Amino acid sequence: QCRSENRQPLFTNKSSLRLQIMVDVTDKPQIVEHVNKSLSMTVYETKWIPSSARFVLLGSPARQTGMLQIYQLNAGSIELEAEVERPKSFKCGTFGATSLAERRMATGDFVGTLAMWDLERLKETMVVKAHDTIINCIDGCGGLKGAGAPEVVTGSRDGCVHVWDPRQQDRPVASMQPQAGEAVRDCWSVAFGDAHSTASRLVAAGYDNGDVKVLDLVAGKMRWETNVSNGVCGVEFDRKDIEMNKLVVTTLESRYRLYDMRTEHPVHGFSFLSQEAHQSTVWAARHLPQNRDVFMTTGGNGSLELWRYSYPQARKIKEKDGHEKGVLGTVELLQKKNFSTQPVASFDWNVDKEGLAVMGCLDQTVRVIVCTKLHKL
């Protein structure tokens, strides 16, 4: 069982204490590797089990099956607690649509299957053929975070984005899909946002051709769309359970964009800044749960970069045409560190322990890292 009272102290041995002392010599945040474990599978997703010191790995061993593993963080090591294998490889997962009491995980695999998992029994409670081909990305809302009903959104190579209610399994409750005769674009990333009340919820989706689309689930129509010129590897709102504030879009060609989503100009749309990062593909951005203005980006060169956003004195100005336009602040690179020669495919902050995170690289490793001094930012 995944109970918070069973958690072990994160740092108990002398070597870990010495490590903490070594990085305390400056006030600058440091990225410290706490645990590094080689695996016999390629890891596509890493997720902390809510309110525990356990995490889930999703991936595929050499025989191309799907593997779900549960690890326990115990002092200076991680221990495999349970695993289950399925015929097809897993690609993505989320706890976003579950309650803290149930802690059920939604997963997507390489053949388009969406499943909800009871991790205590390692059994599926829901299995749906959600897409015709691989589910690249998934997110959840209405469970741990966000007002309203629990929902899961999936994006696929078939060009479709589907929103699912786990209580209604026969069909999606909302969809974005290519029109007849329209080119099918590969959806690489999805994220919920603006879920601050039962009358407000959005889904953002990024595609391989640079399209970013935001669907208003309450109104049932497109809220906004743009193109960022490069394939969109990741999209994430700084918080999914507040009025939409900032949206980070990570792309190929070593760049990400940060949009201010509070003010939309009728001609220019939402204002944004463009930032170079990693000297490689920027796979994802993950905002710190304890501070929404701090976020980590993951690189195709095996690196992590820690950023902080600072707001401008005024977030909007009035243009000569009378319309308001958003004003961007600045981003600051706080720290960076290289861990591998292969991409960092997944990264997840721990909600309960500030600075603790788990990450998976395509070199068949999982790492637990600690970012220090975040409380001083």
Residue positions per predicted region:
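Leucine-biased recognition of intrinsically disordered, low-complexity hydrophobic segments
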Residues: L10, L17-L19
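WD40 beta-propeller repeat fold
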Residues: I21-L215, R223-I242, K246-Y259, S271-Q290, ...
